[in-house]
Structures are given as C-alpha cells and as structure tokens.
From Swiss-Prot:
The active site is at residue 20. It comes from Yersinia pestis. Its EC number is 5.4.99.62. The lineage of its organism: Bacteria, Pseudomonadati, Pseudomonadota, Gammaproteobacteria, Enterobacterales. This is D-ribose pyranase. The gene is rbsD. Homodecamer. It catalyses: beta-D-ribopyranose = beta-D-ribofuranose.
Length: 139
C-alpha cells in the first residue's frame, strides 16, 4: 500500500506524468469539464470532499510553479479565497519557491481548462471554488 498522503490512483498517475508547465485543475461540483480532458470525479455529495481538502492533498504530491484563479472568487467567495491564499503561502514555504498567482475571468478560466491534463472534481458547492495548478520542477 502507498505510504504517502495521496491514495487516489488516478490522481497519483496524472501527477506522475506531469512535465514542467503541464496543468491540472481542481474544481467545484459545477465546473464544466471539457469532453477531451480527463475527468477525475471525487464528488460524493454536497461538500464532500471539500475543495480546500483536495487542493491540500494534491499539492503535497505536486510541485506547483503557478496557479490561476477566477477573479470572481475575490468578491463572490472571499472566505474561501483567503483560506486558499493561506494554503498557497504554506505550500510556498514547504516547496521553498514562489508560486506565481494569476487572476483571470471565469470565462477565460473555463477556456484554460481545455489545456489541462486533468480536471479533478470535488464536492464543493460554493462559487468559483476552482484552481488551475501549473507544474514546476523539483530541481
């Protein structure tokens, strides 16, 4: 049995295949997922698993260089936005790097998901609880 924090085989496989600048998306239950993109559906019921919980576990396995958020999260989901910023700051400290954070419109965000290797769907049911994570290198 795997000893690490991340036990989901599909997510683990996607992360192990990421190269520098490849992207994955962690989304809420309502984020549209392009038909051509790998879907990893974790949603069990409303709020389970939560968005931040999924981001926390995934980023313990993935080296993150940059991230995209929908700019709408700032006004429409300020508590989640603040919690996510704390999580990203902690990740920067663990990784000993700076994560470039970019805000784009939700429409542009949805377009950008088409470039990702996978979309991980959480059970989160709050507005704009989505992030695109760009893969970095560990050296």
């Amino acid at each position: 049995m795997k000893k690490g924090v991340l036990l989901n085989a599909d997510i683990s496989a996607v992360i192990s295949r990421l190269g520098h600048t490849d992207q994955i998306v962690i989304g809420d239950a309502g984020l549209p997922i392009p038909a051509t993109t790998t879907r990893i559906d974790l949603a069990l019921t409303r709020g389970v698993p939560g968005f931040l919980q999924v981001v926390d576990v995934v980023t313990q396995e993935m080296q993150v260089e940059n991230a995209y958020l929908a700019e709408e999260i700032v006004k429409n989901n300020p508590q989640l936005h603040e919690a996510l910023l704390v999580l990203l700051t902690q990740l920067e400290q663990r990784q000993e790097n700076q994560i470039a954070l970019r805000y784009i419109s939700h429409e542009a965000f949805k377009e950008q998901t088409k470039q990702s290797r996978a979309v991980i769907r959480s059970g989160e049911c709050s507005p704009f609880a989505n992030i695109i994570l760009g893969s970095g290198v560990t050296f």
